[in-house]
Amino acid sequence: MNDKLNFKIVGSGPTGLLLSIALSKFDCNIFLTDLLTKDRLIDKDKTYAITHSTRKILSKFRLWEKLEPFLFGFDTLSISDSVTSAFTNLSTSDLDDDISSAENIGWVVKHSDLMNVFFQEIDNYENIFFMTPQRLLRKKILFDYQFFSTGANSLDKKFIDFVDIKKSYSQSCLTFKVSLRGHCEK
């Protein structure tokens, strides 16, 4: 292990796991660590909407086909604003030309299914190691690079004066609750 670069990833949610899978393509050792156990990381009551841009990324790492059995696609999306009473309906005909033949606008996946697929994938790599912070500390590994995937306002980054690189976009993102109505196919 001494002749390879050592990467440490703090935070083993979807971002940390996907980062470890991406870095695993290089000749390096990747040490994933989190305060939560694997079971606790998987067992969260969350759901994600997957867009076509995310689908493309997952496909590059051969994860899309592994996730497909757990995805629920939707071909129309109704967006309404309860304050202004405005609404709009989107369908597959509203997709960009490069993905206009797609049957779905997007997909929904449970957090636990996504995490199970990601953890199963990292188990296939001999250069990715998932450890508790205490066990990792006892190994006394000198890390060449450290990544924190513990959230935007993580205390981890603030405590160790970590360089936090952010990119501002001229777009905004809204978080909202979704009500799923109608026929849902797998």
What does each model-found stretch correspond to?
Residues L18:
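Short alpha-helical segment within the catalytic ATP-binding CA
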Residues F70-I160, K167-S172:
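Conserved N-terminal helical subregion
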Residues K8-V10, I21-K46:
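Glycine-rich FAD pyrophosphate-binding loop
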Residues D43-T84:
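N-terminal FAD cofactor-binding segment of flavoenzymes
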Residues S12-P14:
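Glycine-rich Rossmann-fold phosphate-binding loop(s) that bind the pyrophosphate
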